[in-house]
């Protein structure tokens, strides 16, 4: 097949394509030959995969991990911080944190997990996860709910490895399975023991939004 003609405005096949678009919302260029070449190159590099034979290409765990490391942005909202602070000041510790968790689940459309201490956990928004097609398959849903049944043990296992700053554990890097990602941070509420706040969603979650939600919430709690 002939390549693009000079002056056509279409880059030649093989021109590197920004990997962030493979990780987030890849948009093919206007020339089909260029698009096919770039998609093929991204697939060879492990940034695009086919979940099964008849499926189209989708970003891989490697692509999402690349996006998180290179292009993650913190989107601050003073209004959200004020709402969270007001909720924390109106109720006692655990009740307030649970209310904040429900708010985050509503805003993010994901599940939110709180570890008050090693053997005391709470989660909300589980129904949000099962709206995603990834978790409508029986095996995926079973594995996820099995992990949540052992939530206290899971949080105890990762508690000491959670940083003070918000961090993102993509795919196989988190204990909830390769089809999920976890945005997690350790917080300190007044003179209480440190706790853990986490947002659990699919691999293709909105990383900027969810990271910003967890980070802002952690920062507000730490100021109490």
Ranges and model annotations:
Residues 1-4:
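Short alpha-helical segments that sit at the start of domains
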Residues 7-11, 16-70:
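N-terminal helix-turn-helix
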Residues 72-224:
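Intrinsically disordered, acidic Ser/Thr/Pro-rich low-complexity regulatory segments
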């Amino acid at each position: 097949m002939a390549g693009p003609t000079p002056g056509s405005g279409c880059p030649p096949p093989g021109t590197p394509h920004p990997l962030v678009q493979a990780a987030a919302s890849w948009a093919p260029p206007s020339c089909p030959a260029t698009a096919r070449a770039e998609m093929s190159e991204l697939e060879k590099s492990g940034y695009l995969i086919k979940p099964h034979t008849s499926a189209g290409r989708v970003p891989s765990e490697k692509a999402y991990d690349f996006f998180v490391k290179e292009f993650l942005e913190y989107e601050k909202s003073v209004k959200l911080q004020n709402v969270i602070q007001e909720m924390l000041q109106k109720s006692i510790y655990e009740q307030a944190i649970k209310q904040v968790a429900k708010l985050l689940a509503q805003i993010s459309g994901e599940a939110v997990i709180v570890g008050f201490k090693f053997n005391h956990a709470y989660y909300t928004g589980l129904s949000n996860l099962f709206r995603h097609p990834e978790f409508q398959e029986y095996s995926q849903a079973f594995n996820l709910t099995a992990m949540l049944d052992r939530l206290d043990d899971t949080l105890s296992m990762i508690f000491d490895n959670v940083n003070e700053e918000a961090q993102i554990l993509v795919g196989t890097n988190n204990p909830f399975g390769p089809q999920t990602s976890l945005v997690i941070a350790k917080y300190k509420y007044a003179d209480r023991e440190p706790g853990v706040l986490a947002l659990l969603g699919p691999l293709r979650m909105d990383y900027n939004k969810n990271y910003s939600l967890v980070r802002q919430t952690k920062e507000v709690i730490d100021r109490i």
